[in-house]
């Protein structure tokens, strides 16, 4: 009979201990019940190359002895324990095993989980990663579910994960076979953050995106969803537009066919470059009923709200985002961050490009299904 595998013992990354190296220590917590057991220690001195250590070792706790160390990431700081002097080995082992349980039971998590399903993305995924690395707010994790039938993208994701502990790729079989709703649902279910940030596999978050979202969520703590403005552009740099009316005068203009006249284009500068930004509407009785005027990227759900409304519909291969937006509107308040925070790239071969008729057909039926609830919600919000 095959033996069951042994579980991972508590792991500590230790700085400032005279005993350098990798070794086991035995704790005597609850020794009177015969529960003595080992913990794993990785000891370095002084603190050098912390991010590499944290990425490769994946410790439960970080012990700093006589060292005043602080990470730039708050979720990492919550795992740090400062000691003034070197304890006996059994005391150190007891601290490690106890604090491993206490901290892992304290729901330590980053504020933002950026979630991304990938499909034959290849090198384009590096553009998405570059946008994350350049964020002014760095306490994030990136949860990816590779839905590719080959290994090319997976190899790139594994390499990123080995160099950055915040990158967390997953391969789930069977793959979805093109069911975008299921792929996004899987990615969100694996995410630990307080907020879930949707990013497509070849897109780009502008540098202040997460910082601006952090400020907005703190300003309006009762809201469960946020969205911003974006620029849609092609791989050659040409920018997409709907109609030819620019600026705020386009709002409500009879010749503006962008988002039924509620959406506008405007020029804005980011990183020394001018972009044609798209401002999608504030929620109103018309915009919430149509997929072409619903909130666009960047879209962000508070995780408890996302779970409460059921997340992305696993049985909707397309139009899943519209259905989720409607369900979110019925449940919570929304924040419109009126700033361009997202670059959405179009390679003429996206899910939207290849399924326009099916997406619009399903979206109209979703509107019909939720129409009365939308009406009642609008009445409720108007009270």
What are these regions (language model features)?
Residues 196:
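Short aromatic/hydrophobic "clamp" motif used to bind/position activated sugar donors
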Residues 146-156, 200:
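A conserved acidic beta->alpha catalytic loop
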Residues 2-7, 85-131:
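N-proximal low-complexity "stem/linker" segments adjacent to membrane-targeting elements
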Residues 130-139:
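Short, acidic, metal-binding catalytic loop of nucleotide-sugar glycosyltransferases
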Residues 173-191:
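Glycine-rich, basic loop-to-helix element that forms the pyrophosphate-binding segment
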Residues 250-254, 340-347, 353-382:
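Catalytic core of nucleotide-sugar-dependent glycosyltransferases
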Residues 210-268:
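Conserved donor NDP-sugar-binding/catalytic core segment of glycosyltransferases
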């Amino acid at each position: 009979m095959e033996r069951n595998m042994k579980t991972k013992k508590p792991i500590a990354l230790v700085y400032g201990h005279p005993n350098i190296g990798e070794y086991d220590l035995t704790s005597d917590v609850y020794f009177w019940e015969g529960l003595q057991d080992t913990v794993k220690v990785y000891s370095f001195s002084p603190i050098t190359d912390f991010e590499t250590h944290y990425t490769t070792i994946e410790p439960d706790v970080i012990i700093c002895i006589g060292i005043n160390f602080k990470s730039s990431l708050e979720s990492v700081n919550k795992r740090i324990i400062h000691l003034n002097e070197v304890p006996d080995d059994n005391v150190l082992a007891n601290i490690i095993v106890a604090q491993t349980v206490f901290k892992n039971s304290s729901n330590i998590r980053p504020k933002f989980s950026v979630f991304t399903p990938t499909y034959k993305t290849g090198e384009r995924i590096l553009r998405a990663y570059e946008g994350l690395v350049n964020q002014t707010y760095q306490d994030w994790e990136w949860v990816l579910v590779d839905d590719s039938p080959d290994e090319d993208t997976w190899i790139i994701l594994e390499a990123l994960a080995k160099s950055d502990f915040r990158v967390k790729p997953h391969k789930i079989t069977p793959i979805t076979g093109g069911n975008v709703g299921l792929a996004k649902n899987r990615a969100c279910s694996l995410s630990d953050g307080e907020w879930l940030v949707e990013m497509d596999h070849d897109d780009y978050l502008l540098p202040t995106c997460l910082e601006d979202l952090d400020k907005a969520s703190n300003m309006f703590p009762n809201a469960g969803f946020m969205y911003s403005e974006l620029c849609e552009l092609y791989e050659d740099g040409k920018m997409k537009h709907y109609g030819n009316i620019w600026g705020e005068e386009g709002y409500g203009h009879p010749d503006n066919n962008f988002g039924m006249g509620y959406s506008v284009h405007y020029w804005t500068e980011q990183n020394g470059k001018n972009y044609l930004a798209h401002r999608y509407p504030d929620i109103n009785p018309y915009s919430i009923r149509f997929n072409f005027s619903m909130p666009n990227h960047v879209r962000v759900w508070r995780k408890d709200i996302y779970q409460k409304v059921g997340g992305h519909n696993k049985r909707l291969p397309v139009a899943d985002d519209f259905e989720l937006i409607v369900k979110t509107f019925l449940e919570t308040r929304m924040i419109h961050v009126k700033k361009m925070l997202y670059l959405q790239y179009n390679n003429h071969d996206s899910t939207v490009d290849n399924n326009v008729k099916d997406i619009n057909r399903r979206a109209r039926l979703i509107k019909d299904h939720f129409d009365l609830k939308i009406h009642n919600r609008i009445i409720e919000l108007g009270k």
